[in-house]
Amino acid sequence: MTIKLHDLKPARGSKTPRTRVGRGEGSKGKTAGRGTKGTKARKNVPVTFEGGQMPIHMRLPKLKGFRNRFRTEYEIVNVGDINRLFPQGGSVGVDELVAKGAVRRNSLVKVLGDGKLTVKVEVSAHKFSGSAREKITAAGGSVTEL
């Protein structure tokens, strides 16, 4: 026998109707399963209520400061990274750094001066630190800001 889509039925007992409580004196009537008297019988206790203990949102410190929405974020590449990724020297731009996996696509690049540079490179990036600019020119290379 093949089962057809229109013959499918839920398993017996898996679909039970919602119990309507507090409707008359029958089962689940009157106190509606809440017991007698007390806060829990009369109304809901807030989820955040901790029984008189100082609540967690008041125990934790407030966050200080703010996050500037207009800040420009740069991907950082050090001079030592350029030396390691381009041992033969040459022209180094954002596209070459993306191809080598040093930075992500469509990101602004800032070159910092950590590490040593032993090869002549022509670097083009969005920003340069002073020490990076000095090290690149000292190695015989050139710096171009985009």
Swiss-Prot record:
One of the record's GO cellular component terms: cytosolic large ribosomal subunit
Transcription listed as a keyword: no
Start and end residues of each stretch annotated as Disordered: 1-52
Biased composition (Basic and acidic residues): 1-10
InterPro entries in alphabetical order: Ribosomal_uL15, Ribosomal_uL15/eL18, Ribosomal_uL15/eL18_sf, Ribosomal_uL15_bac-type, Ribosomal_uL15_CS
Example GO molecular function: rRNA binding
Domain of life: Bacteria
Ranges in coiled-coil conformation: none
One GO term of the biological process aspect: translation
UniProt entry tagged with the keyword Cell inner membrane: no
Function: Binds to the 23S rRNA.
Family recorded in the similarity comment: Belongs to the universal ribosomal protein uL15 family.
Protein name: Large ribosomal subunit protein uL15
Natural source organism: Mycolicibacterium paratuberculosis (strain ATCC BAA-968 / K-10)
